[in-house]
Structure formats: structure tokens, C-alpha cells
């Protein structure tokens, strides 16, 4: 077994320290230095979980609960959650008051609708929590082998584990808690771990236990085993772990290399032994399971204001009515006789007692508040939740946003922000993996001052297209001009990750080059300085590489293709097959890995210290140019000038560059370094990282330059077209990238973010004054001068814009300048400049800066922001934005797990916003407006009837008519509108992207439109009430000669309202489906069915509605004629207004509908008329780009 394990290990082994979830160390690095104040109080007695010392610590058990409720707390807690909503609380108060004599209706009719709405939501909450409970039980009852204390292991449930337990986890099992790895089935205590449940990554990580515990590979070895661990307190940082283990009187440092996280899985390893360090809710995965930031859409926030406005209206009407009622009641008694004798004051000592009119007015106020509660739509919240869930399903099922290659559909991870997708003003995008494929290809390099590689990048092709001529590449060495045809340019490399072509160094020809020794060191560094795992296919014996980043894979593949094949790795060695410069033969060389100084976004470099077979010590380093050039020795700068020029050329071509350098170490220097780095790593304190950084700074210096690499990260398919279409929609696009400024600018041109003849405002600190200060000045002086310089450049930029004459501008700013631009006293001036530009590119941006820029844009202009990214370094930006969109690419799933919506490719953003965003915004906006319209139409008739009856608190309708209006007779059509309505089809949404501005400018949910719908409700109620009253008043209603009473008038008005609100819905719908026809007409049919069946019930149940339809309304011709006349008269004003609006001042979607109706959608002239009609000249967005393009054409015309 051990022999087989060793064989597998040789195929897959890697430096485990670098493979403990390092992909996101950058964004958590700062938090690590702040862990818990003192933060290192956890003490673990390994193999002694029941010792008195361990018991006194009172650490949490391993039972995990993710439910919101327990059986005891479900009812009170869920009710509390429901009644936190103001509307629900209002209906609760009116429901309670319905049990008092003050109620104008029966208590049951008031409570049943509330119970229906609250009950539906509680059932949903209960089902969801029950599912969570089932999942919790499944996890907590899993079994794992635990040491009994006598050298044997028994299976126990996860929930019974205690701190200090020794557990045995076998292949393909999940780790039950956070463990310190002690040993494994491999001799050197390594194991393979899959972290899919933590970060979504499928590539395996390798962990390794301490050498001192690696021999504990049998169960009986743990009899008598004792160890003492002191480590950091529980925290949410997945990527750090600091601690020490005391064993046999010696202390050993612990790091993420030894930490096995709960819910990750053991793979390709037969078993491991580990000590439980964190349990239950102290484990890092549970610490990370807090809810994401709560986000609410702008429409939802505005809806709350409308609810408050409706409350104010209800209170106002109740107050007016109670005052009038009080005055009338006071004047009711004249000469001992009651004017309104039918109110029977003798039966009620308070309500209608003229002697106590103020008290009667107060009681009337409470009654009126209950009666007018129908102004507030009780089913609004539930209906919106249902609609949003169904909208999300449509987004998830959209075949046009399904990425077949990776089998990844779009996924709305929350339905709260659907309508917000239709109001995005600014998009803030990452570049690598978001705009690009994050699939790196080694294409060029500079070695010893000589440029190699003749590949042509997409950016170079775009530059050629901008200049309008053929693409010409000039070789440095041969001065040969080569014009590449389209076929040659697009020819794909036969080796993934390698698109390098240059016969001077391929096929071993590098040995004849002038600086062959430098070339050898260059590619040897690529073959050795990395964290890649080699894998051997047992059938073909071909080696493939598993790397944490595509850059690393590209470097190793390039080294292999050029004669330096990395083929094996152990914990302490790397094996490379390479061409010997002296003998000319391929030889196998073994490099002993002594130390690894890992890469992170702060260091921007990675180094390894290796020992060659002859004992020579080498430090091999690769990193970003801005940190590497300053670390070169005086004698190591021989090729610096040429390399800098080449790096700038590569950046112009849109390539990602790294500088390669090395130095030889003497044994004494290395010995001192190794002692200091070991001491720093052994430190158990919050400044451990800074101590390590301090030590590495002293060794990574005096380097000798070898050259630079250049890899291409190609744009994703459809990115330029998508950006162009989003710009046409008037959406501003910012790109936040860690690339060099030159690279970012040229990528901007390649992806249509920048246009030729767009003027550029560039803000950076590469000025002679600042550079001279950096060499001689102090930090405070440099910072002050830099800040003043940035402010000056921002002000100059604003001046340029002011006198630009309408020219389009692009703002480009680097990371150093951005740090000062985000200071509190400058950031608002910077924002004013940025939002006035057509495009903004922030270069060399850190993850923190991305989040700060997003926060600034969101809070600064008050409009909706959308952030899109694919990596862990984008998480802060995604959570800060109003909407976070994660790209499910190749950098793991952390961005997706922190996002609101996930898509597989950037190009799908076009359809997500312009189609689904526009539809959802329109649907939700119209739905909310209609909800308030139909409730005002219904509720205001109650007020008018109250006025007609001198505010006697008598409702116009039967109790159950009141209760079921919002539930059965008017709710389904509005839900159907929210799910299915389309003002224009998806095709025309994309063809006329400016339609999207209706959402950005909030045209469909402005106060003007909201108040317009409210006014529609008020005048509809007035028309219905007065026409019905006038038509029925003082005349015989049927053949018996009876005049209509409350039941007849109320039944007639109610019928008219049901017809009006449902036909109003039909007039508001733009796109009819069979479902909409069914729900509209069925709502009317259900009303007639209900009034018939309800009226047949005994009179003690149906009260005034007893046989009112069958015996009074239906037989009467006037009832049907009045219904027809009132419905037509009520809807006619809206119909006339819509016709006039469409004819004389159509909205943008109306113009598109007219084009479609007239069949002119394919006529370019008509389409241009429609497009231009909605465009206002501006210096941002599409019109600015269009003007830049036109000027470019005009400028080039004389030359042609």
C-alpha cells in the first residue's frame, strides 16, 4: 500500500504550503493581521478531550445548526419577522380591533385574509427551514472513527466530537471538523484535499503534517500519544492558520499546510489521522456562512414610501370623517328629537350619542381606520415575492444564457434584485477572467535583452484595424517584415497554453544564441520556480500539469516545449529534464527545494530557494516589473533598458508580463535567513505575516536580471460587441484591473471600451518631481506631494472636460494615484471627473481599491451600480455593489458564491440587463402601480359611500366582499402581468438598446407615474360611485317596485369595480398570453360564481348578500345596463389618454411598438429615426462614442 502511495505521490506531489487555498490570500491578508485582538488563546490537549483542563475551556460542541427556527421558536419568531413589515402590522392592529364593537365588519372577514397572507409566508418559511433541518441531521449524524484512548478507533457521530479528539478519516470522506493533520497513509504525512464545498475549486490541494508526527501511521501508535496545541481563536479566514504544537518538550510551528477544513474531502489518500482543533460553529466554514449583505432594490425602497403615503391618506380621511361625524352627531339632537333617528342612539350610549360627540368622533376615527384599510394592498408583498421567484426561474432557464461548453446556465442566486437589473447606470468590471478567458498562452519573451516570439495578439490586431492598415511585425534580430494574413493570425496553437513561434530558440536552437547561458537560466527558472503538480497518464505516459493559476501552467508548458521539462516533484525536490549546454545531451537534474516564498497581491512576486546537485544555492524569483526592477543589483542590470522597452511593447500588445531574476546565495547568508524565517513562522502572534515579510525582504534583493515573460489572456467571445451594446444602452462601464496602464489601455481598445479619437485623461505619479522625491525624500513628504499632484491632475482633467466642446473623454488612473484619489477630501472631486467621462479604467488596482471605488460610485451618484468579476479578489467589489454578478470561470467559485447572479460568460450580461433587466423592471413597476390603483379604486368608493351616509361607519359592501377583493377577484391578473408581460420582444430589446434608459431614468416608476396611477384610481372610484348612485337612486329597481338598498347599490358597484380593474389590466398589458386571458376573465367569472353561491347560503351566514344576485341583480336589466355603461365610462379616460400619448408624445417603447405594428422594424431609415429620437448629446455613454467614431471618420477622409 505504501509503495503504491509513493508512486502516486511522485506523480502529484506539490509544495503543500502553497496549495492551501492560496487563490484568495490576497483579499484576506489584511484581516489576518487583525485576528481577534490578542486572538491566540485557543489551547487544545490532543488525545485528552476529557481532561479537566480541556473541560474548563467550554468550547462549542460539534453540533451544527443552520436553521432559523426551532420547534419552540418557530411561531413567535416567524410571526415577529412577518409583523416587522409595516403593512402587516397595520392589518394585525385592524384585525384585533375587528373583535371590538367598533368594527364595521365581522372579525372573521378581517382576520381570514391576514391569516391567508401570513400563513402562506409562514408555510414557505417552515418548509425551507424543515429542509435545512433535514440537511443538518444528515450532516450531524455522519460517522467518523475516533480514538478511544486504548489504541483502537470506534465510529462515532460527528455531533459527538470534542476538541482534542484524534480522528481517522478515510478516502473520499469529508473532514468532520477543523483538524490538524498528524499523519497519513503516505510516509511523509501528505494528503490530497478537495475543497469544492469551500471555494468551488475542483483542483486538488496537498497538505502535509509535521515531520515529528508523520510516523504515527497505525492506530495503536496513538495509545499514550499526547500533544499540546496553542493556536489562533476561531475566525472566518480560510487562508490562514497560526499555531504551535508542543510535543516531547519541543515546539513546532503550525500553518495552513497542516490545517484540514471541515467539509473538504480527502482524495487520493487512503486515510489520515488528525486532531480536532475547531468544532461546530467555531469551524472556519461555518464562520464563513454568515448571510451576505442585505440588498434591497430602489423600487422596493420607494414602495415603502408609497405605503407610508397610503397610511397618511388613510389617517387623513379617517380624521376628516371623524371630525365631520363628531360635528354632525353633536348637532343631531334638536328640541329633544334626533334628526338621524335610524341610528338608534338609545341602543348605543357612545357611538351616536350627541351628548358625548367628541368621544363618538374618536371611536369613529378608529372605525374609519379599519374601514379604509382596504387602501393598503394586503397581498402586495406576497404577490411580489411570487412574481420575483418566477422571474428568477425564467432567468435560470434562458437557453440564450447557457454556456454549453462548460454546461453552466445563468443562475439568479437571489430574486430580490430582479428589477434592479433594469436600472443599472454603471458597470464596474474586473478584467482577467471576466473580460478575458483567463486561459493564458505563452506567446513572447525577452531574454538577455533580446525579444523572442512572433505571435500576434488580439490587441495588436485591434491596433492594426484602428490604424486601417495591414498588421506588420518587425523582428528585432532579422529586420524582416512579416505581414500576417487573417488565417495566420487566427491559427490555433497545437499545445494549450503555448502559442510561441521563434525558430531561434525552439528545437534546441537556443544553444547557438549569443547569451545561451542566460537563456538556459531563464527557462530553468520557469521549470523550477512554481507550484505545479505533474500528472502522468498511465496509458500514454504523457505528463500534464495541474496548476492553481493558468499563468503557472503556461510557464511550465513553455519551459517544457523549449527543452526544460518538469516531470516529477516530491515534498523537497523538483526534477527537470533539460538540455545540457556543454554536452548537448538531455539530462535529468534534481533540485532540492529549501524554501518557498509565496506570491500574494502585496508582495507581487514569488521566490524559491533551491540547491543544485553541485551544492550551489540559488534564489529564483519572478514578479511584477514595478517590484522586480527595484530589487536588481548594480551588476544585475545589464539588460534592464532593453527589457523595460520590451515589457512596454508587450504591455502595448495587451500581454501580461513578469520579470525573471535570480541570485546566488552563500551558505552563511542562507543559514542566517533560514533561522530567521523559521523563527518568524514559529511566531504565534498577529504580526507573524509582517515578521515573515521582513525576513523575505532582506533575501529578495541584489537580483540579476534574466528577462521577462509575456502571456496572452484572450478576450472572451462577444466581449467587444457586448460592451458596445451596453454603451449604446447608455450604461457607463468602468474596468478595474491589476494590469499595467499600457496593457489596460490597449485591452480597452480591443474590447471597444475605448474608441479612436476619444481624448484620454491619464492620472499617474510617473512625473519627474515625484520620481526624484521617491529617490531622496521621506515618506511623509512623498505622500503629501503625491496627493497634491493627483488633485492637480484631477482639476486639470475637469478643466479639459469643461472646455472640450462635447468631445468624448476616457479617464485612466493607476493604483498609486487611485489610493490618493480615494481620500475623503478628494474622492468626490475625482467622482465628478469620472462620471463625466465615457469610459474609466483603473489600473494596478488592489482588491480593496476595487471595493472602495465601487462604494464611491454607488454612494456618490445615487444610481444603481453593478459589479462583475470572477475571482476571490473581486468578492469585496461584488458585495459592495447594488448588484454583484459572478462569472463562473476557471478561478474557482468564490466570486459566484458571493454574487447575486451568476453567469458563465461576460457576453451574457447584454441579455441579462437589456432583456431580463428591462422586462423585470417594467413588470414590477407596472405591477406595483396597478396594485395601488386597484386598491384606491376599491377603497375610495368606501370613503365616498361613507360621505354619502354622513360618515355613519357603514361599509358599502358585504363583509366577505371586502375580504376577498384582494385575494380572489383582482390578484391573479397582476401576478400574471408581473411574470409574462413584455412591452417589446427580446429581439427588439437588443435591437434598440436605448430602451434600457427607461429603467435607468426610472421613467416607469417615477412619482409622476405613480401619482398618475393613483389619480386613475381616484377618478375611477368617483365615476363608479356617482354613476351607480345616480342610476339607482329614487327609482324602482325591479318589477315589484322596490327601491335599491345598500345591498343592491353595493353589489352593483362591486360588480363594476371587478370589471373595471380587470379590464384596466387588459388595457395595460402589452403582450397577451393564454394564461393572462384565463386569469383576467376567470377573475370576473369567479366573482359571479361567488356572489351566486354565497347568496344561497343561509342568511345568518350571507347576511345582506342573501339571494341578492339571484333574486335582485341578475333579473334586473338595469343592473346589466348600468354595469356596461359604468365600465365603459370609467375606462374611457385612460383609453383616450393612451391614444393621445401614443400619437403625440410616445414613450420609447411605444415607438418600437409602432415600428413593429407598421412592419417597419427592418427598415434602416425608420429604425434610425426611432434610435435618434431618444438620444440626447452627452459626453458619456453611446453618444460620446458615436461622436468619437464620426470624428475619426471625418479626420481620415482627407487622407483617403
From Swiss-Prot:
GO cellular component annotations of the record: membrane
E.C. designation(s): 7.6.2.1
Record protein name field: Putative phospholipid-transporting ATPase 9
Active site: 430 (4-aspartylphosphate intermediate)
NCBIfam families in the cross-refs: ATPase-Plipid, ATPase_P-type
Matches recorded under CDD domains: P-type_ATPase_APLT_Dnf-like
Ranges per topology, Extracellular: 98-101, 329-364, 946-959, 1033-1045, 1096-1112
Localization terms from the record: Membrane
Family in the record: Belongs to the cation transport ATPase (P-type) (TC 3.A.3) family. Type IV subfamily.
Amino acid at each position: 500500500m505504501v509503495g503504491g502511495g509513493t508512486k502516486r505521490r511522485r506523480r502529484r506531489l506539490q509544495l503543500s504550503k502553497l496549495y492551501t487555498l492560496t487563490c484568495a490570500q490576497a483579499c484576506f491578508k489584511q484581516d489576518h493581521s487583525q485576528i481577534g485582538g490578542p486572538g491566540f488563546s485557543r489551547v487544545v490537549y490532543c488525545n485528552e478531550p476529557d481532561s479537566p483542563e480541556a473541560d474548563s475551556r467550554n468550547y462549542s460542541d460539534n453540533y451544527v445548526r443552520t436553521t432559523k427556527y426551532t420547534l419552540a421558536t418557530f411561531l413567535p419568531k416567524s410571526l415577529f419577522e412577518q409583523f416587522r413589515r409595516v403593512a402587516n402590522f397595520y392589518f394585525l392592529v385592524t384585525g384585533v380591533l375587528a373583535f371590538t364593537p367598533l368594527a364595521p365588519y365581522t372579525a372573521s372577514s378581517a382576520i381570514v385574509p391576514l391569516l391567508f397572507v401570513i400563513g402562506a409566508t409562514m408555510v414557505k418559511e417552515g418548509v425551507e427551514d424543515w429542509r435545512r433541518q433535514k440537511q443538518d441531521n444528515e450532516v450531524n449524524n455522519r460517522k467518523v472513527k475516533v480514538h478511544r484512548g486504548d489504541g483502537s478507533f470506534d465510529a462515532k457521530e460527528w455531533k459527538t466530537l470534542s476538541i482534542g479528539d484524534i480522528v481517522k478519516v478515510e478516502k473520499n470522506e469529508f473532514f468532520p471538523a477543523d483538524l490538524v493533520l498528524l499523519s497519513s497513509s503516505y510516509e511523509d504525512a501528505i494528503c490530497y484535499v478537495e475543497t469544492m464545498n469551500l471555494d468551488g475549486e475542483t483542483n486538488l490541494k496537498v497538505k502535509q503534517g509535521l515531520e515529528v508526527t508523520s510516523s504515527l501511521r497505525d492506530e495503536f501508535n496513538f495509545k499514550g500519544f499526547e500533544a499540546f496545541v496553542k493556536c489562533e481563536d476561531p475566525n472566518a479566514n480560510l487562508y490562514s492558520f497560526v499555531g504551535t504544537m508542543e510535543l516531547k518538550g519541543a515546539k513546532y510551528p503550525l500553518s495552513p499546510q497542516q490545517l484540514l477544513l471541515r467539509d473538504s474531502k480527502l482524495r487520493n489518500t487512503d486515510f489520515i489521522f488528525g486532531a480536532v482543533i475547531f468544532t461546530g460553529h467555531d469551524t472556519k466554514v461555518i464562520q464563513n456562512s454568515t448571510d451576505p449583505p442585505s440588498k434591497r432594490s430602489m423600487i422596493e425602497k420607494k414602495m415603502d414610501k408609497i405605503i407610508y403615503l397610503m397610511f397618511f391618506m388613510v389617517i387623513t380621511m379617517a380624521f376628516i370623517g371623524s371630525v365631520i361625524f363628531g360635528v354632525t352627531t353633536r348637532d343631531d339632537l334638536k328640541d329633544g328629537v334626533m334628526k338621524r333617528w335610524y341610528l338608534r342612539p338609545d341602543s348605543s350610549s357612545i357611538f351616536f350619542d350627541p351628548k358625548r360627540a367628541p368621544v363618538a368622533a374618536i371611536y369613529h376615527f378608529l372605525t374609519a381606520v379599519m374601514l379604509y384599510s382596504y387602501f393598503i394592498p394586503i397581498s402586495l408583498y406576497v404577490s411580489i415575492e411570487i412574481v420575483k421567484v418566477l422571474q428568477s426561474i425564467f432567468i435560470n432557464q434562458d437557453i440564450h444564457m447557457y454556456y454549453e461548453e462548460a454546461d453552466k446556465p445563468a443562475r439568479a442566486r437571489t430574486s430580490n434584485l430582479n428589477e434592479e437589473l433594469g436600472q443599472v447606470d454603471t458597470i464596474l468590471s474586473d478584467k482577467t477572467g471576466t473580460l478575458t478567458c483567463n486561459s493564458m498562452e505563452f506567446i513572447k519573451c525577452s531574454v538577455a535583452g533580446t525579444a523572442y516570439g512572433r505571435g500576434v495578439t488580439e490587441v495588436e490586431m485591434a491596433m492594426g484595424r484602428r490604424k486601417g492598415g495591414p498588421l506588420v511585425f518587425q523582428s528585432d534580430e532579422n529586420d524582416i517584415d512579416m505581414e500576417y494574413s487573417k488565417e495566420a493570425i487566427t491559427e490555433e496553437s497545437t499545445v494549450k497554453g503555448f502559442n510561441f513561434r521563434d525558430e531561434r530558440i525552439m528545437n534546441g536552437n537556443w544553444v547557438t544564441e549569443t547569451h545561451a547561458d542566460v537563456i538556459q537560466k531563464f527557462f530553468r527558472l520557469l521549470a523550477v520556480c512554481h507550484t505545479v503538480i505533474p500528472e502522468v497518464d498511465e496509458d500514454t505516459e504523457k505528463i500534464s500539469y495541474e496548476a492553481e493559476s493558468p499563468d503557472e501552467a503556461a510557464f511550465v508548458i513553455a519551459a517544457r516545449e523549449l527543452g526544460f521539462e518538469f516531470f516529477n516533484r516530491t515534498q523537497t525536490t523538483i526534477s527537470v529534464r533539460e538540455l545540457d549546454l556543454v554536452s548537448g545531451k538531455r539530462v535529468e537534474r534534481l533540485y532540492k527545494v529549501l524554501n518557498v516564498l509565496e506570491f500574494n497581491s502585496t508582495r507581487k512576486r514569488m521566490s524559491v530557494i533551491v540547491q543544485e546537485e553541485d551544492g550551489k544555492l540559488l534564489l529564483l524569483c519572478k514578479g511584477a516589473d514595478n517590484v522586480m526592477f527595484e530589487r536588481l543589483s548594480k551588476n544585475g542590470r545589464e539588460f534592464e533598458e532593453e527589457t523595460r522597452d520590451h515589457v512596454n511593447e508587450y504591455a502595448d500588445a495587451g500581454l501580461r508580463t513578469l520579470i525573471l531574476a535570480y541570485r546566488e546565495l552563500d551558505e552563511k547568508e542562507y543559514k542566517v535567513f533560514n533561522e530567521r524565517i523559521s523563527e518568524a513562522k514559529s511566531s504565534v502572534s498577529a504580526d507573524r505575516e509582517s515578521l515573515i515579510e521582513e525576513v523575505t525582504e532582506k533575501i529578495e534583493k541584489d537580483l540579476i536580471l534574466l528577462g521577462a515573460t509575456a502571456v496572452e489572456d484572450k478576450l472572451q467571445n462577444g466581449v467587444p460587441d457586448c460592451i458596445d451594446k451596453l454603451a449604446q444602452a447608455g450604461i457607463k462601464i468602468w474596468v478595474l484591473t491589476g494590469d499595467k496602464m499600457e496593457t489596460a489601455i490597449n485591452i480597452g481598445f480591443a474590447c471597444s471600451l475605448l474608441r479612436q479619437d476619444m481624448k484620454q485623461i491619464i492620472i499617474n505619479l510617473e512625473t519627474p518631481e515625484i520620481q526624484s522625491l521617491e529617490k531622496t525624500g521621506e515618506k511623509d513628504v512623498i505622500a503629501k506631494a503625491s496627493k497634491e499632484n493627483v488633485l492637480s491632475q484631477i482639476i486639470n482633467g475637469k478643466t479639459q472636460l469643461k472646455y472640450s466642446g462635447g468631445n468624448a473623454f476616457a479617464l485612466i488612473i493607476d493604483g498609486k494615484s487611485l489610493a490618493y484619489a480615494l481620500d475623503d477630501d478628494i474622492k468626490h472631486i475625482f467622482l465628478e471627473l469620472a462620471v463625466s467621462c465615457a469610459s474609466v479604467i483603473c489600473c494596478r488596482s488592489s482588491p480593496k481599491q476595487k471595493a472602495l471605488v465601487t462604494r464611491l460610485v454607488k454612494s456618490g451618484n445615487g444610481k444603481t451600480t453593478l459589479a462583475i468579476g470572477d475571482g476571490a479578489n473581486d468578492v469585496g467589489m461584488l458585495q459592495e455593489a447594488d448588484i454583484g454578478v459572478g462569472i463562473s470561470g476557471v478561478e474557482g467559485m468564490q466570486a459566484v458564491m458571493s454574487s447575486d447572479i451568476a453567469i458563465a460568460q461576460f457576453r451574457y450580461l447584454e441579455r441579462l440587463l437589456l432583456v431580463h433587466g428591462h422586462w423585470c423592471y417594467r413588470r414590477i413597476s407596472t405591477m406595483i402601480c396597478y396594485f395601488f390603483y386597484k386598491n384606491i379604486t376599491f377603497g375610495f368608493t368606501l370613503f365616498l359611500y361613507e360621505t354619502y351616509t354622513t360618515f355613519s361607519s357603514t361599509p358599502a359592501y358585504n363583509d366577505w366582499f371586502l375580504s376577498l377583493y384582494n385575494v380572489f377577484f383582482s390578484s391573479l391578473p397582476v401576478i400574471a402581468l408581473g411574470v409574462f408581460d413584455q412591452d417589446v420582444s427580446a429581439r427588439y430589446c437588443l435591437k434598440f438598446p436605448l430602451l434600457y434608459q427607461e429603467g435607468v431614468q426610472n421613467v416607469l416608476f417615477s412619482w409622476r407615474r405613480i401619482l398618475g396611477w393613483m389619480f386613475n384610481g381616484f377618478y375611477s372610484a368617483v365615476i363608479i360611485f356617482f354613476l351607480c348612485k345616480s342610476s339607482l337612486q329614487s327609482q324602482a329597481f325591479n318589477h315589484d317596485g322596490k327601491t335599491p338598498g345598500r345591498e343592491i347599490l353595493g353589489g352593483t358597484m362591486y360588480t363594476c369595480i371587478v370589471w373595471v380593474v380587470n379590464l384596466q389590466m387588459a388595457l395595460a398589458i402589452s403582450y397577451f398570453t393564454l394564461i393572462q386571458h384565463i386569469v383576467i376573465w376567470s377573475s370576473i367569472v369567479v366573482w359571479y360564481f361567488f356572489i351566486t353561491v354565497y347568496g344561497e347560503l343561509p342568511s345568518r351566514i350571507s347576511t345582506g348578500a342573501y339571494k341578492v344576485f339571484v333574486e335582485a341583480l341578475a333579473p334586473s336589466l338595469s343592473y346589466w345596463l348600468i354595469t356596461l355603461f359604468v365600465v365603459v365610462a370609467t375606462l374611457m379616460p385612460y383609453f383616450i389618454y393612451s391614444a393621445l400619448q401614443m400619437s403625440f408624445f410616445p414613450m420609447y417603447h411605444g415607438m418600437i411598438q409602432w415600428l413593429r405594428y407598421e412592419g417597419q422594424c427592418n427598415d434602416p431609415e425608420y429604425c434610425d429615426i426611432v434610435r435618434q429620437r431618444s438620444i440626447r448629446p452627452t459626453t458619456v455613454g453611446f453618444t460620446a462614442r458615436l461622436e468619437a467614431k464620426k470624428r475619426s471618420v471625418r479626420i481620415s477622409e482627407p487622407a483617403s
